């Protein structure tokens, strides 16, 4: 898992550099190859994950395994004296860190590209394996609010496999 956390952190940093047109040694996120140790395939049960699917799964796991990586999203937009809308995210009742939304995933993977954004939206449809295999989903978007404003949440079953290396057994 640590290799994937490092990879996620690198891709997140590059995503921000590219979005804000900062100096960056990469011209696209896909140039950063994910680890090939098979860990993510094992815990998801999916053999051929795409780059974007790997990123979404790791984004959803970050609050549970390495929440400080997401602190970058607390940066303020000095033009409006508020956080960047495009980062999405929310703050929990007891967790002081950044909790990602679908908007966060869209920012990392699509930036301002509306066609890529459509691809991110497809990840959260009920026919995608994120949902059918009970890995993760978007929850809690308020009535009339944008679809991607929903909270990016991993299932208890998936968390059990990731954090405890065992199948979830409800009480």
Predicted regions and their residues:
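Intrinsically disordered, low-complexity N-terminal extensions of AAA+/P-loop NTPases
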Residues: 1-171
């Amino acid at each position: 898992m640590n290799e994937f956390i490092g990879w996620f952190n690198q891709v997140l940093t590059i995503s921000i550099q590219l979005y804000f047109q900062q100096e960056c040694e990469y011209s696209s996120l896909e140039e950063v190859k994910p680890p090939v140790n098979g860990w993510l395939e094992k815990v998801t049960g999916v053999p051929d994950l795409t780059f974007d699917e790997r990123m979404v799964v790791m984004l959803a796991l970050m609050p549970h395994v390495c929440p400080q990586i997401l602190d970058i999203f607390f940066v303020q937009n000095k033009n409006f004296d508020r956080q960047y809308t495009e980062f999405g995210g929310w703050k929990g009742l007891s967790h002081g860190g950044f909790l990602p939304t679908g908007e966060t995933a869209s920012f990392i993977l699509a930036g301002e590209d509306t066609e890529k954004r459509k691809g991110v939206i497809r990840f959260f449809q009920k026919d995608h394996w994120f949902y059918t295999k009970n890995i993760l989903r978007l929850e809690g978007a308020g009535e009339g609010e944008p679809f991607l404003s929903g909270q990016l949440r991993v299932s208890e079953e998936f968390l059990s496999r990731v954090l405890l290396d065992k199948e979830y057994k409800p009480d």
